[in-house]
């Protein structure tokens, strides 16, 4: 059932999360590197290897929200500092069954390197995990993937190579939620349509699209503004 993402209704008095708020993220080799990264409204929780979270620096690290890249066995996740709000795993397709059985103390996003994208997404959602969407997949695959995620409770994360791909992901997620043509949204994303979303509709999109990992979040945020989608 499509979700009505109304464009013109007046917003409520509460301020839900904006469409770009804390959307972008990147990988950092160490927690210190994540702490030194520039801050921006559009930049969210950094990705840091779990193996780097055993000797965290004092001070602001205590309140830092991070995503733990799962590079240690799940049974070795006690005593991490700071405690990850989400975990992330890159998984070869032949090890998908192992990933499906992993239990960690926070939501887990799994990027599978090959295989049928929507079929893999269904398996991960069924296991309670969030699928990861890699860049460069065909529009038909992405549309089928989003048809799975639009009505799942896990959401998904994605990786993008530039601001254009981030814009397309946002437009496609909106289209999937509304029951519109996802392929058309991917091919010709309309930033003006996205900026007209009321706050509640933008928040609904972000319940599905959790984060987008890019190489240079500040540059991508600037490029998104140049494409007509400033942070708000």
Predicted feature residues:
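Catalytic alpha/beta core domains of metabolic enzymes, predominantly
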Residues: 125-187
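Phosphate/adenylate-binding glycine loop and adjacent helical scaffold
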Residues: 2-131, 143, 152, 191-232
